[in-house]
Structures are given as structure tokens and as C-alpha cells.
């Protein structure tokens, strides 16, 4: 996919600017931010926020309103929240961080829309957890999680090796009422439009493989399982069966998701994906028109969007 290669080049330029601007690697920046956060906490707060790296809690994740472990934002003072946000800001790209902030802000909007008729909404009910001891050369993890947002990062020997599971969702999907100036706002519109654009471009013959069902899945296929392998069983149309233009569309979708993370890490991830581009599979379920329920996925040998 030539476009994916070009987009990768852009990210490489951004990644090269990271050391120039900050002078530190992901491991150095994230561990420094995490250590500052932990240093700002009182003993009882730190007890809630920290776990051993091998603790089973590290692989526990959930994206619905539920009881969680970790230290919630509501139990932090403004300074501590600032330190917590600093970890997120060096783990994500600027755009990824903005999306995360907008997801949390939508919880307040839901509270106003539902007026207490649904689950309790709380824009401060997002939890920060540190697994292991943050160290520039160490092995540790970081999680930021709440309703519709689950961000998980793992560092091994000081290198950021994983940003999954990663979950960004939006409710309402599109703001249709209330809040002057916000009506029409759709947080994940670009991701949605890119997937629909590719699906609509498929020919009748291609749709025999690419369209799995007229009915979308009723919920997230992976749920909060620890491993996604085999859940969709690599069904769909192979990237090798796409036209050049369609491959470019596929590359744009992949770039949009991967570039939520910091540029240097995203560049490495895109390089790895480009190496297995002929093994990618795209699948669509549901309607093709805006507003119709739908679900799409992109799957490779070791990952699932």
C-alpha cells in the first residue's frame, strides 16, 4: 500500500522531531511523568493507584460503566490530575489525547441528556493505574480507563512495546440536541466515514468476501477478552484482492487508528503492519448509509482493529 508507506514517512518525520523537541525516548518521558504522578500522591492514594507488573489486574480491562480498580480522577486534587494527564500526553499523539479528553467530556453531556434515567454518568470517574515501577530502562505498565475509554501501555526494558487493548468510543455518536454549538459534533466521524468509503467502493464480486452480513454485530465482538485472536476468524476480503485505490483507503483507516499514539511508537507500528500488508483482511457488516447500524474490522496476523 503506497499510501501507507507515504503516511509512514510523515510519521517518521514527526517521530524524528520528538527527540529533538523533548530529548527523551518514550520510556524516559513516560517513566518520568509516571514517577512525578506517583510522587504527588498520598500513601492511601498510591496504594489504590499501584499494582505489581505481574498482577492479574494488568490484563483486566473493561469499557462500560463498572466498578474499577485504580485511582479515580475525582479523588485527585488539581495538581495530581495535572501529573496524571502528563502521562497521557506523552503516551498519545496530540490528536489521540484530544479524542480521549472529548470522550470523557461526553460523560457530562450524557448526564445532562439522561437526567438520571440511565447509568450514573461521571466525567471524573476515570481511573489511573500503574503496574510495576516506572523506570526509564524498566518494565512496567500504565492504564487510563473509564466509560468508553480504555488505554493500556506496556513498556519492556524501557521500550514502549504495546498500546493495546485500546478502546475509544463515543456516546452519543452524534450530538443531535441541546448544547448550543455542539449539535452535529461526531467524535469518531472520520473513522466511520473512512470505513464506509472503502465498503461502498467494493464491487459486487468483492462484496461476496468483504460483506459478512446485512445485520451488524449486536455488540463489540471482542468484548473485554484478553486476546482477540480467532474471534472474527480472519473473515473478509483480503487486501491483495483490493484495487490500488482501495488499498489506499485501507491505509488511511489504519493510519487513523495507529496515529492516536505518540509518533515514534506509531511509526514503528505502521512499519510492522506494512511488513504484513498482504495478510490484511477487511470486513463489513450492516448498512452502508449514514445512520444505519454497521460494524467493520481490519485484521492482520497479530492485531485486530
Say what each PLM segment does:
Residues 8-20:
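Bacterial N-terminal signal peptides
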Residues 1-6:
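Positively charged n-region of N-terminal signal peptides that target proteins for export
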Residues 24-93, 97-305:
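A cross-kingdom marker for long, charged
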Amino acid at each position: 500500500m503506497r499510501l501507507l508507506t507515504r503516511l509512514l514517512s510523515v510519521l517518521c518525520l514527526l517521530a524524528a522531531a520528538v527527540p529533538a523537541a523533548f530529548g527523551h525516548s518514550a520510556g524516559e518521558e513516560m517513566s518520568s511523568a509516571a514517577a512525578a504522578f506517583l510522587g504527588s500522591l498520598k500513601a492511601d492514594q498510591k496504594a489504590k493507584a499501584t499494582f505489581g507488573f505481574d498482577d492479574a489486574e494488568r490484563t483486566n480491562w473493561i469499557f462500560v460503566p463498572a466498578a474499577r480498580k485504580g485511582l479515580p480522577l475525582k479523588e485527585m486534587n488539581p495538581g495530581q490530575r495535572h501529573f496524571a494527564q502528563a502521562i497521557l500526553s506523552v503516551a498519545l499523539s496530540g490528536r489521540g489525547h484530544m479524542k480521549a479528553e472529548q470522550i470523557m467530556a461526553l460523560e457530562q453531556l450524557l448526564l445532562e441528556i439522561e437526567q438520571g434515567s440511565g447509568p450514573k454518568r461521571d466525567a471524573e470517574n476515570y481511573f489511573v493505574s500503574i503496574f510495576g515501577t516506572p523506570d526509564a530502562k524498566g518494565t512496567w505498565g500504565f492504564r487510563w480507563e473509564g466509560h468508553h475509554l480504555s488505554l493500556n501501555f506496556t513498556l519492556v526494558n524501557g521500550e514502549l512495546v504495546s498500546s493495546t487493548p485500546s478502546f475509544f468510543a463515543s456516546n452519543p455518536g452524534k450530538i443531535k440536541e441541546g448544547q448550543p454549538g455542539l449539535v452535529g459534533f461526531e467524535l469518531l466521524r472520520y473513522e466511520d466515514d473512512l470505513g464506509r468509503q472503502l465498503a461502498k467502493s467494493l464491487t459486487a464480486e468483492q462484496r461476496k468476501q468483504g460483506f459478512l452480513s446485512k445485520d451488524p454485530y449486536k455488540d463489540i465482538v471482542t468484548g473485554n477478552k484478553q486476546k482477540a485472536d480467532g474471534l472474527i476468524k480472519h473473515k473478509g476480503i483480503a487486501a491483495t484482492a483490493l484495487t490500488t485505490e482501495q488499498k489506499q483507503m485501507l491505509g488511511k483507516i489504519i493510519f487513523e487508528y495507529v496515529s492516536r499514539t505518540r509518533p515514534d511508537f506509531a511509526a514503528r507500528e505502521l512499519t510492522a503492519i506494512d511488513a504484513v500488508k498482504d495478510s490484511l483482511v477487511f470486513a463489513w457488516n450492516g448498512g452502508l448509509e449514514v445512520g444505519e447500524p454497521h460494524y467493520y474490522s481490519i485484521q492482520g496476523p497479530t492485531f485486530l482493529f
